[in-house]
Amino acid sequence: MEHQLLSVAIDDTDSQYGGCTTHLTGLILKELGNRALLADYPLLVRLNPNIPWRTRGNAATVLRLLYDGDPKELMETLWSIIEEYTEPRPPLPGKSPGLVVAPGSPWESERLRWLYRKALSDVVTLDVATESLSKYGALWRGGRGVIGAASSLAALSPGEPYTFELTFYRRPENWGSRRCVYSDKVAYLEGQSSGTLNNLELDEGTTSAAPGGPDPVLAGFRGTDPGELWRFDEALCERPHFAVLYRSNQHTGVHLQAQEPRIYRSVNITVTVRSPPLKLPGGHVIVEVSDGVNTYDAAFYEDSGPLARAAELLYPGDVIIIAGGVRPYSPRGKLTISVEAMKVVGVAQRRVQVPPRCPRCGARMESLGRGKGYRCPRCGLRSSGHKQSLVVERELLPGSYYYKIGRARHLSPVGARLPTMDRLPVTINVSDVLRVY
């Protein structure tokens, strides 16, 4: 039988007992072995991070295959693997695995591209997802996970920016125990690399690539050069089970879209600062902003580092572009935008009122009290002059500000220049992206 192009998408298999959709995808790759050629790298697709009922990282996976078998038989085989995987590790409460098998090139479908964009920045319901699949002619099975699986089919099309994540998985006997990753070695490899992203928190010297939960991930290293990423196995002091190289939309900022702020949306809007920043206990900064129609509270969190420090320097009248997630109303009755990135477009002129200079000696005079005039501290001259207005030099400069490296959310941009893929499909061997230790 001639090879046909198929896309397999999976979501919602995460479990508090150790399940993980990317881990399951790696097991499926091992099962497929040389029976299928890949038409792309395995895809790790992050969706809207602001959905409260999402899985931990709100990620689905997609395998684009050149397959010579029956799509329905593949569907049944994969569903059996999913059932076998999730039976001893039930999905998180309210979750239900989803599987989609789609023929052809779903990244060329206008409807599926629309679905992907919506799932990145808004809420998608199951009926919208299944209607899109039905119109395209895809097969699907499962529950809520079908939403993420369907929404990921058109991700990472030619021309879109992308990054890589090389994920190392733990041996089952090590699940739940403390991970062993040499932070010093990670720091050394970071220093030797030109295309790594968000793997190390420099201030604390910790490895952000290593998670802390009971899931089977040992560490996931991100960057733009697969060759550099494979070197990070030198930083592991725990023998991994296997590793998978994913192409991903992580750190592309693709979810931050220009649209009206509504609860749970991801937005990218131009606003004007309306009031001086309010610094809260703990270091968080709240700034009241307006888009000309509505006002919002822009929240800059302490762990964002340079982003929060820049927010402290904002001043009424500054024009900024803020990108982030919309949260429910704040105590002040406004929608809150949790800021992931900010671009300062225009810095307002800041003026202060100061006492006049002494007309005799030129020293700055001192106020004698409300309505009592001024006195020169140098020569003693008294005067009933008026305050002067002076322009104060602003410390804040126009430009882009991002989260501190090591603390950026999965999709948040980090200011790096990212590659794009010219065409699809391509031909990749499973052995190029899967390594068993």
Curated annotation (Swiss-Prot):
Superkingdom of the source species: Archaea
GO CC list: cytoplasm
Keywords: ATP-binding, Cytoplasm, Ligase, Nucleotide-binding, tRNA processing
Subcellular localization(s) per the UniProt record: Cytoplasm
GO MF entries: ATP binding; ligase activity, forming carbon-nitrogen bonds
Keyword Ribonucleoprotein: no
Predominant localisation class: cytoplasm
Protein purpose: ATP-dependent agmatine transferase that catalyzes the formation of 2-agmatinylcytidine (agm2C) at the wobble position (C34) of tRNA(Ile2), converting the codon specificity from AUG to AUA.
UniProt record similarity statement: Belongs to the TiaS family.
Name used for this protein in its record: tRNA(Ile2) 2-agmatinylcytidine synthetase TiaS
Organism: Acidilobus saccharovorans (strain DSM 16705 / JCM 18335 / VKM B-2471 / 345-15)
